[in-house]
A protein has these predicted regions:
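Bacterial Sec-dependent N-terminal signal peptides
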Residues: 1-23
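Boundary/junction segments of secreted and surface-exposed precursor proteins
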Residues: 17-47
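Surface-exposed, low-complexity/disordered Ser/Thr/Gly/Pro/Asn-rich loops and linkers
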Residues: 36-57, 81, 113-116
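Short beta-strands within extracellular/lumenal beta-sheet-rich domains
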Residues: 47-65, 130-135
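Extracellular/lumenal ectodomain signal focusing on beta-strand-rich modules
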Residues: 63, 72, 87-89
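Extracellular/lumenal carbohydrate-interaction signature centered on repeated Trp-anchored short motifs
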Residues: 63-69, 140-143
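A short beta-strand element within beta-rich, extracytoplasmic domains
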Residues: 67-80
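Aromatic- and Gly/Pro-enriched, solvent-exposed loop/edge beta-strand patches characteristic
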Residues: 79, 86, 91-148
């Protein structure tokens, strides 16, 4: 009986473990220093600030089933080191928007969004282009549709 109980606990434990996958959206081939998520006025600038908003459509996210938990986000960034501590926050929202216009305010973009990553001491990647990875402090449940 004890062996069956332990086996049952192991099956329950391993049954709760999910699988993970990596989904790349877009080509990830930007070579611009101002493409986000951090804006720099020039490649050598010490001015680092931004508020970026991205929309990932249901078509782009078709490989992600509704109900999936997002635990990490990456952006591909051009060269340029930012070593000074910076405030950096990532907000995510499930919604039905299909476009963002230049008239869309930050208040509209951030309304109803969940803060999934927040750092007051964020440095950024080294001098070579590459992926900037963020493990979310608050995992996010994707419900299907557009992700903003």
């Amino acid at each position: 009986m004890r062996k069956l109980y332990v086996l049952g606990l192991l099956l329950l434990f391993f049954g709760q473990m999910g699988w993970s996958q990596f989904i790349q959206i877009g080509t990830g081939t930007t070579s611009s220093y101002l493409s986000g998520p951090i804006y720099r006025s020039a490649a050598t600038s010490t001015f680092n600030w931004s508020k970026y908003a991205y929309i990932y459509t249901a078509t782009e996210l078709a490989a992600i089933p509704a109900g999936s938990m997002i635990t990490q986000i990456e952006w591909e960034k051009a060269a340029g080191t930012i070593t000074a501590p910076n405030n950096f926050e990532i907000l995510l929202a499930n919604n039905s928007a299909t476009v963002l216009t230049t008239a869309t305010t930050w208040g509209v973009v951030s309304a109803g969004a969940t803060s999934v990553y927040n750092s007051t001491n964020q440095g950024f990647m080294g001098t070579a282009p590459g992926w900037e990875s963020y493990i979310l402090t608050t995992p996010f449940i994707y419900t299907g549709g557009t992700l903003q």
